[in-house]
Amino acid sequence: MKIDRERSIITLKIKLRGIIMYKFLLTKLDQDVYELFAHFFEQAVEREKLNVLAEKTNLSKRRIVLVFERALDLQKAYPYFEIALHEGREMTLYFAPNFLLSKLYSVMLAESMPFQILDRLFSDKYVSLEETAQQHYVSNRTVQRKLKEVETILENYHIRLNLKIKPLFVGEEYRIRHFFHIMYWQIYDATNVR
């Protein structure tokens, strides 16, 4: 009985860490895209009025329009859905038979700055703060804030980031391996259908 309880606690901690990473690595807009798609996917609806959708998803109509625009951008990288906004009052979202919500998440994750920073750090290909800012068309200060966010998530795994000396990741090796295993699993595993 005690062993089952300990396993449950460990499983819960792992799930919470995954949620924390999910919340951290995606922008707020991408999180909203994911939640909107999850609503359509899980409810098996194809058409929804914006005011009803706003109520069900806790997003404003204006935010839903931003989500729609972001979804159009994502459609170029992952074309397994059709999305349309009709007269600013109704949204339709059709999924192809091979659409995976987890794959959409992977596409958004691959584009996110925190993931790209962590990926470069992991592969020892990190470039300077200025180059990173130029690659993402943001200010140096924005990259610094993203690095702070990266440090925050690493702290959840008892890992520190030290850009001055190698190794860049400071912590117990099994924790570092576990963190990157989880991170890469989230982007490359397309079997987890929500």
Region spans (language model):
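Inter-domain helical "communication" segments and dimerization helices
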Residues: 1-194
